[in-house]
Amino acid sequence: MNFKYSFIFLFFIQLAIRYNNAKITVDTICKGGKLIQMSNHYECKCPSGYALKTENTCEPIVKCDKLENINKVCGEYSICINQGNFGLEKAFVCMCTNGYMLSQNICKPTRCYNYECNAGKCILDSINPNNPVCSCDIGKILQNGKCTGTGETKCLLKCKAAEECKLTGKHYECVSKPQAPGTGSETPSNSSFMNGMSIISIIALLVIYVIVM
């Protein structure tokens, strides 16, 4: 009886964690990645060599070929597992995490299997996670549930003072503002060299002044 209640408790804990992770908002902090915006949703984008383990956490991608890489990220929403019989035989496989399945070589939410959006991607409805919906590429908008319309989407990302929101490919992201010509600071080595030359010039002028006087 205790085991039964423990199992139910763990099940709801996992469900709560998953539901919480699925809510990526404009205030979400992406661990190891950066927040991007499409037309209807936000998501975390990982740098090269990293992939999403959960909706807001990027981890290094490993090659699924040895025991120490078990349960580590081997692709987007996928982890390395050992399918060997009771550990006696090694059969390392990169498999989609719970709630995702392989579709066109990408781990997508199970509810999004074979759900086409045209110029966009399938995501789960933030209000009803059982419903697949389309989030369009920037420049496209929903039309009859698909990303077939043309329209503008305003960037709502909260970029830092030294950043600006920029359309990168098919999404918005915060990037560093370009420096105006001539406003960039000198490198430390150049600055030190120039300071040294200034001091030498001043000393030389003083010596010449003393000799002349």
From Swiss-Prot:
GO terms for cellular component: cell surface; plasma membrane; side of membrane. It is found in: Cell membrane. The keyword Magnesium does not apply. Residues 30-59, 60-108, 108-148, 151-175 form the EGF-like domain. Gene3D superfamilies: Plasmodium vivax P25 domain. It is a lipid-anchor; GPI-anchor. A lipid is attached at N190 (GPI-anchor amidated asparagine). Residues 1-28 form the signal peptide. Glycans are attached at N190. Residues 191-213 form a propeptide. Its main location: membrane. It comes from the Eukaryota. Keywords: Cell membrane, Disulfide bond, EGF-like domain, Glycoprotein, GPI-anchor, Lipoprotein, Malaria, Membrane, Repeat, Signal. SMART domains: EGF. Disulfide bonds join C64-C80, C74-C94, C96-C107, C112-C122, C117-C134, C136-C147. The keyword NAD does not apply. This is 24 kDa ookinete surface protein. The lineage of its organism: Eukaryota, Sar, Alveolata, Apicomplexa, Aconoidasida.
